[in-house]
Amino acid sequence: MAGLPNSSNALQQWHHLFEAEGTKRSPQAQQHLQQLLRTGLPTRKHENWKYTPLEGLTNSQFVSIAGEISPQQRDALALTLDAVRLVFVDGRYVSALSDATEGSGYEVSINDDRQGVPDAIQAEVFLHLTESLAQSVTHIAVKRGQRPAKPLLLMHITQGVAGEEVNTAHYRHHLDLAEGAEATVIEHFVSFNDARHFTGARFTINVAANAHLQHIKLAFENPVSHHFAHNDLLLADDATAFSHSFLLGGAVLRHNTSTQLNGENSTLRINSLAMPVKNEVCDTRTWLEHNKGFCNSRQLHKTIVSDKGRAVFNGLINVAQHAIKTDGQMTNNNLLMGKLAEVDTKPQLEIYADDVKCSHGATVGRIDDEQMFYLRSRGINQQDAQQMIIYAFAAELTEALRDEGLKQQVLARIGQRLPGGAR
């Protein structure tokens, strides 16, 4: 792959950050580093990177600095939620800021052992970067038949540094949900300050037979941050997984969700809401493999694009040859709020089996004039009318959040990104 003009400089810096950790890194992390160096960074000429600008990131001077945060500072950034909370600061687990997990139903160990984690479903260069620079793996297990009373909240706090340097932090987690288990896991990403930083995130999840997963991702970082994430879900027979991502902050945010349905009668829901404002770019990508028959999947991805923002959606459903009775649907709906706002959408199907029911679709539009006229004629001012329409557009996604307090906090974040909000 042809690299960016400054690709070599960025790769050299990342290599140096890896070597600064000495010889304690796992063989798997070393292999990912070698793959990163062999692959190089993509350019706009590469189809999958055509709309994701990298120049503002790769010409940076990277550092890896672990800051200290007090409980009061953590609380100022935290969600108000009754959950078992694990806190990570600048890529590192901080036990003093985290809850004890004994008796919670979650077994947690943190080390650099990667023997039991699955291979990537769809590997690419920034996945290799996070796998190589993440200093440890958070191993989470929920035993057979267990149903923890509280959600597990993974809170990630990344700080920028003064000057031209960019602090880089990489987070690596793995969850094993055993047979018949049920759990809710929330990823929460925030910025400690207003300075630039670069976050890499990788989360792999095994959902065993008859297990049920509720996964929520909240990307609430600052408007000059870069965030590249790769989540993999693997489902066995009769497993269920619901994944909801709210991508609400970042100069460049690229979120990948890759899934394999490896058992019959599994059920999958993948939803996302992205709201790029000003000059932000939000790139949402899904890759779904229906590898066994009698499975059901639904995807709903929505974007609300303001100012000069750009939203990108690229999704693919692949139905294997023997995956009969597959029922898969993927929908991407986009609402443009500015004359210079842009959307690029590419939903795709690859079907190699007979007797399946699959569909995909995409819509791009602006606020309906008749809707606006109806609201204005009832004495509602233009800004309030716009906000009502936007909240209604997002409601199909926000209403899927079971916890009312969490839903209200997501709605508040949406409100900050609306015209007139504090962005």
Go through each PLM region and give its residues.
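Short, low-to-moderate order helix/coil transition modules at the start of elongated helical scaffolds
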Residues: 1-202, 210-212
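Conserved beta-strand/loop scaffold segments within soluble protein domains that form the structured core
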Residues: 116-380, 394-397, 401-423
